[in-house]
Amino acid sequence: KQLIRKNNQTNPSSLLLLLHSHFLSSVSFGVSPRISEMEIGAGIGLYPLHRCKTIYLVRHAQGIHNVDGEKNYKAYMSHDYFDAELTQLGWQQVDSLRKHVHSSGLHKKVELVISSPLMRTMQTAVGVFGGEGYTDMSDVLPLMVANAGNSSRAAISSLNCPPIITEESCREHLGVHPCDQRRSISDYQFLFPAVDFSLIESDEDKLWKADVRETIEELAARGKKFLNWLWTRKEKEIAIVTHSGFLFHTLNALQNECHPDVKKEICSHFANCELRSMVIVDRSMLGSDVSVTDYPGKIPKGIDLPSDVTVVEDNINDE
């Protein structure tokens, strides 16, 4: 009652918030350090469903550059690895992830696949999420032609699978390393006929520089911009096939306010062909989606003042 008089709160909803805040500030947190850390520093978040998207983050399978690069970082400077394609082991990793995507039912949930426009990511994207049973007799273009990027693989069908588009902003760390330089879009369109390249503005690679390496801050900012761009898309469940550096620096830059174990789960380096399912939340009204599952109530209309609000109003009047 003293709290009510002091703050002159007469609006019921404001009063409830005030009482809730006062209760929390008055609670003694005499609990174990682990519980305190989890409950105080990493509380549960609650958001409207229509302001959330599920994203399936995938790092590409093993590329030819990874084999030597993981032994000696300087190997990434070799022009032999220009726009590196997948190794045969990489294709086996693709096959394994494809089996998981189908056995788990993800192939029925994913509405859109976004791929970085490099050979290894597009090979991974079409191999994991593409259709099956392509024949030359089909009048539908394949996602990938036979033996694209020295794959020794048959053509991959574009039937019965989500659309696959490419987007420059989810590319790997730009500059210096030839493995991260892309070919012309004209070349890719021949190798990946049914992949959508319409978002790529330039045929030649104007983003990659031989003597300038993108800073980590620039990469992280690009990653955040990419995630914000997802809110311009209508799809709610999106697979993104991209790169280790892009994923690591983008996710770490988000500074998630969560338990350290959860943060580690989100931000640790991805293995080749690893998939992680995550939810992103539009907390800044970036998107304009309207909920298709919410229901406004009051149909037909009637008196429906909540009983707890009525009690609060009665208590105020008693004073």
Segments the model singles out, each with a brief description of its role:
Residues L219-R233:
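A short, acidic, amphipathic alpha-helical segment used as a generic capping/interface helix at domain edges
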Residues L19-I55, I64-Y73, Y134-I156, E172-A194, ...:
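Acidic, low-complexity terminal tails and accessory targeting/binding regions
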Residues T54-V58, I114, K236-F246, T250:
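Beta-strand elements within well-structured catalytic alpha/beta cores of enzymes
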Residues G30-C161, I165-T166, S186-L191, I216-G223:
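Active-site-proximal alpha-helix that buttresses catalytic centers in soluble enzyme cores
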Residues M77-A84, R171-V176, D203-A220:
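Surface-exposed cleft-lining segments at the edges of enzyme active sites
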Residues K1-S28:
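Intrinsically disordered, low-complexity basic segments at termini and long loops, enriched
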Residues S104-K108, L230-K236:
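Glycine-rich phosphate-binding loop signature in dinucleotide/nucleotide-binding domains
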Residues C170, S186-Q189, P193-A210:
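Histidine/lysine/aspartate-rich catalytic loop segments that bind and position anionic ligands
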